[in-house]
Amino acid sequence: MFRRNDTMKLFRATLVAVVLVALCVSSLMNAPAVAAAPKTITVATDATWPPMEFVDAQKNIVGFDIDFLKAAAKEGGFEVVFKNTAWDGIFAGIEAGKYDAIISSVTITDERKKTMDFSDPYINAGQILVVPKKDKTTKKLADLKGKKVGAQIGTTGAMEIKKNAGVELKTYDEIGLAFEDMAADRIAAVVCDTPVAANYALQRNEYKKNFKIVGVPFTEEFYGVVVKKGNKELLELLNKGIRQVKSKGLNKAIEKKWLR
């Protein structure tokens, strides 16, 4: 026989269970959300291109690009780890999945867009000509016909030299080697990005007495962060940070630190 008391006991037990479940759900809903760990992005850079990216006396990778991307990471809610990578293999590395992105003074070009994706531009830096101060006649690249002009291999500087018939291109693995050759009179001039030219010709004690910048930038070039073709998620994350840095004017302080 099923007695009434048994029914009441069952009802009370069920009611207690329902209340406990409700309290647990309410507690979970009101608990502070645990923040997701920031996404960490491994970024390749050829740290031989001061003041944009280089290794300092303490063996740290520093420079304009490094500070800019750190600021973008902070604004965009992600973290970055930098990996020093030689320029001649840097683009192949991203295809092979050795890292997630590249920030290394990479000029955005239509040709490069065919095989890789770029973030929003983060700085405009055109090519410019650096010559010895004793050179009183050179005003532009075309004036150097019959002479050797140096640039880093695979850069837009090297591409610009090739456009000038009669000017002999000499390429280098590192831009600093080109300036060393010019100091030793082995080449007549160097073509490089304006920020790099400013560093070597205007800031470095060993060169600023002997080198000068001539003319004005003869290209308009925008640097972007490179990601593997089709990686839209990472591109959106990077662009979010870049836009925040620029809209807040944080890039101005970074430019003042490295480019003035």
Task: Specify the residue positions occupied by each region the protein language model found.
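A ligand-binding cleft/hinge motif common to bilobed small-molecule-binding domains
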Residues: 92, 104-114, 160-163, 188-219
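Extended ligand-binding regions for polar small-molecule ligands
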Residues: 66-75, 135, 148, 153-155, ...
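Ligand-binding clefts/hinges and TM-proximal coupling segments of bilobed small-molecule sensing domains
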Residues: 36, 156-172, 209-214, 239-260
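Periplasmic-binding protein-like
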Residues: 47, 123-131, 194, 198, ...
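Short helix-initiation/N-cap motifs at beta->coil->alpha
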Residues: 66, 81-92, 136, 153-156, ...
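Short helices/loops that flank or line small-molecule/ion binding pockets
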Residues: 74-75, 83-84, 88-101, 115-117, ...
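Flexible hinge/capping segments at coil-to-helix
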Residues: 35, 132-148
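Extracytoplasmic small-molecule ligand-binding "clamshell" domains
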Residues: 36-105, 114
